[in-house]
């Protein structure tokens, strides 16, 4: 995923990956992480996801990282949230009461920003990367998370040849092979969601599975 590709998607508002509702797996499984209300939660490649509002409503302090400036600005404007903006190194920092977003490259995000994080949520980050870049992202995510951090990972899997991503297909085998060195992995759920995704039906994708994993940083 080249930066120019991502910026163009947002500029053209070709953001089919953005969900208009809170992710059902987040609602169903987040409480299984057993987190105190004031937990700091890291959301990589957060876009303008409404899931961050859900996390804030649980009492959490949300720290997001997003490459595209328009996505960050739309998050605050769409949700009618006042914010302050400052510069932190290479990143622009947007702050409201419980949500703190860093606009810039996740690969240059300072570890100091996430050193107090004890939880994370990845619904649209891992599946945003083509396979050639995905393992590099997974290692960067692990490097940003303190040992013992727990998180919810949501993935999509389908025959990759049937559709040009993003979102890209991430199989259970890939998760096990590439994440198990840094995380303990528990499969929470896997279900067929093809009927809920018209884009995939239109492209004649034969099947589409959404899976939820509980991860714990080793």
UniProtKB/Swiss-Prot annotation:
Its EC number is 2.1.1.67. GO terms for biological process: methylation; response to metal ion. It catalyses: S-adenosyl-L-methionine + a thiopurine = S-adenosyl-L-homocysteine + a thiopurine S-methylether. S-adenosyl-L-methionine binds at residues 10, 45, 66, 123. It holds the Pfam family TPMT. Belongs to the class I-like SAM-binding methyltransferase superfamily. TPMT family. This is Thiopurine S-methyltransferase. It comes from Shewanella baltica (strain OS155 / ATCC BAA-1091). The lineage of its organism: Bacteria, Pseudomonadati, Pseudomonadota, Gammaproteobacteria, Alteromonadales.
